[in-house]
Amino acid sequence: MRHYASMLETAEASIACLEKQELNALYVGICHGEYNQHNVVRTDDGWRMVHFENYAYSWRVVDLANFMRKMMEKHNWDVALGDALVEAYRKEYELKQEELQKLYGILLFPEKFWKITNHYMNSRKTWISERDIEKLKKVIAQETERLNFVENLFHI
């Protein structure tokens, strides 16, 4: 409960940022929905994406944000790596300022904290598992780095 207020404030800032954004047809397309390292495989013909069960018509940066979030969690929110990921994406697709604002709003949301606490609330258990407690402690410990990453990546 000690961290709830700050996480809620961050979530509200994220939502406020995203609510300002329109679903501009120029920036939408088919998104994988769960684009991460587990859904990219190497074949004899090159790299391929698999598992499109969660695909959707949405902002293109949603897949980039999901991929970045997974990578950054595993690399302690390294700003240099985040910059490299955005630049690699930019080599393939132009990122307009409006899309960068969407990316900022998505990455600002404390998704992992929400995911863990939501899992607990919906499990209908009277106790939280030791595994979930450890996950929650890790997320809370990384929160300062995560927020610094978002601020530095977008020069805020």
Name what the model sees in each region.
Residues 47, 55-57:
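Activation segment
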Residues 42-45:
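Activation-loop N-terminal segment of eukaryotic-like protein kinases
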Residues 5-12, 108-111, 141:
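Generic structural signal for well-ordered, non-transmembrane alpha-helical segments
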Residues 1-30:
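ATP-dependent phospho-/nucleotidyl transfer catalytic cores
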Residues 61-94, 107-126:
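Active-site activation/catalytic loop segments of kinase-like enzymes and analogous catalytic loops
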Residues 29, 34, 39, 51:
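Conserved catalytic-loop position in the HRD/HxD motif
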Residues 114-156:
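ATP/Mg2+ or Mg2+-diphosphate-binding catalytic cores
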